């Protein structure tokens, strides 16, 4: 029993060390991944794509956010408390919120996005001379 616990502990330590050593590469991959797929969810909702397509996209985002939160938690485990360790989970929460909204109430999200687009466009037209 002690050998199994020791082996699992060693593997966990190695995974955490790998995560911290390759932080720039991991964040450099996961942040754009989540950003692009969350934006794609918004595009799918506005274009009224099939719910299955939106759900598949959301599942990919949930996986990416989970990996990002696990990566950030390795920094919390060693006591590193910096701005990125708080911004990345907040960014992940926004991505999850967008995708939850897009999968559970796409009509509401579509109305909001169209309202936002019209509001921004009207302000821009008023600002021109």
Question: Can you name each region flagged by the protein language model?
Answer:
Residues 109-129:
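Short, highly charged, low-complexity non-transmembrane loops/tails of multi-pass membrane proteins
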Residues 63-64, 88-98:
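Alpha-helical transmembrane segments and their membrane-interface exit regions
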Residues 47-54:
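Membrane-interface helix-boundary motifs at transmembrane edges
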Residues 37, 67-70, 95-98:
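Membrane-embedded alpha-helical transmembrane segments of multi-pass integral membrane proteins
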Residues 93-114:
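C-terminal halves and exits of single transmembrane alpha-helices
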Residues 59-75:
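A generic, lipid-embedded transmembrane alpha helix
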Residues 1-46:
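Membrane-helix boundary elements
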